[in-house]
């Protein structure tokens, strides 16, 4: 079973699905593959928008694969041209990317969602950065979140690990739209 699948929807929409049971985590190999997919998308003339989502309904992504770290993979390894998750650092990005958040967006998964141009979330989705609970700062979370939220709320999420429901994330402008899971890919 492939970890990443792509398909063309309506001819101009590229759907990218992450499928790494149990929590759709991302290791360096997966990140490099995502970078290649998003770099190709950026250059192709067929697709005008990409939708990035994940398999299942529990996790959009739990971010970095901690098991890969336990097996010796360096946390700061080569993620590919687009950075961790394939597109947050992609140079000359010229087409919109939609994160279709189908479950929990945790740590790096939340950071990847924030790097998208639009976020559509299932009504049961949650967003949080638990890294500081184990003494690690959430890399991009410390940069992106304070740009989206009042500083005090951003600090509470970054340093306190506060969880946001999809509805609360929408009320603060992090999420563009909250929909039932059945409507996530069609809204």
Label the model's feature ranges.
Residues 91-187:
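Crotonase-fold acyl-CoA enzyme core
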Residues 28-29, 64, 111, 140:
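Generic recognition of short, well-ordered alpha-helical segments
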Residues 16, 52, 65, 112-114, ...:
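Hydrophobic/aromatic residues within transmembrane alpha-helices
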Residues 32-39, 43, 66-102, 137, ...:
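An acidic, glycine-rich surface segment that forms the CoA-thioester-binding/catalytic face
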Residues 23-24, 59, 135, 177:
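Short strand->helix junction
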Residues 25, 59-62, 68-69, 107:
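Short active-site-adjacent helix-start/loop capping segments
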Residues 1-57:
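Conserved CoA-thioester-binding segment of acyl-CoA-metabolizing enzymes
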